[in-house]
């Protein structure tokens, strides 16, 4: 039996998903997101994420906290913001003594959908199917967080050890 918390980092919207594995079966224990106001001071936005992750860790005692690796696109401001959110998650995990792993978006999509360039709707459908959920998880940030947790749990043990 193992619990993994997946995180889709971002400062405006940070998704989370908690997945439980027992005897090879996966089920969602919960999912959601933290939304912060655009006008809020950056340190307060990061505090919201840090406290949210810390509360999830305390409640679920996960074996790991897993994140989607940062994608550095054309907008440096967004990349910096996502990096700050990732930092809040990593520190919350380190304070609690929980191992962290990171996965590339293409690897997550390949594991969950069988196709590394799957779109958001395909990821949501497959997360619903894999976790036997009654409906597709929303918002997409939460679905992405569940997907990274699934990736960690379904990936090979050797790959998890090097993630």
Named regions from a protein language model:
Residues 1-163:
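Phosphate- and other anionic-substrate recognition elements at nucleic-acid/protein interfaces
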């Amino acid at each position: 039996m193992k619990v993994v918390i997946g995180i889709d980092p971002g400062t405006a919207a940070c998704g989370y998903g908690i997945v439980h594995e027992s005897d090879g079966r996966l089920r969602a224990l919960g999912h959601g997101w933290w939304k912060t106001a655009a006008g809020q001071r950056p340190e307060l936005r990061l505090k919201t994420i840090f406290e949210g992750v810390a509360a999830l860790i305390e409640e679920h005692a996960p074996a790991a906290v897993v994140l989607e690796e940062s994608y550095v696109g054309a907008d440096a401001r967004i990349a910096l913001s996502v990096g700050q959110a990732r930092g809040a998650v990593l520190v919350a995990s380190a304070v609690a003594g929980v191992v962290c792993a990171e996965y590339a978006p293409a690897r997550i999509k390949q594991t969950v959908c069988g196709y590394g360039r799957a779109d958001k709707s395909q990821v949501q459908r497959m997360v619903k199917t894999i976790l036997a959920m009654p409906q597709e998880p929303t918002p997409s940030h939460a679905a992405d967080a569940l997907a990274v947790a699934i990736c960690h749990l379904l990936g090979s043990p050797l790959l998890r050890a090097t993630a």
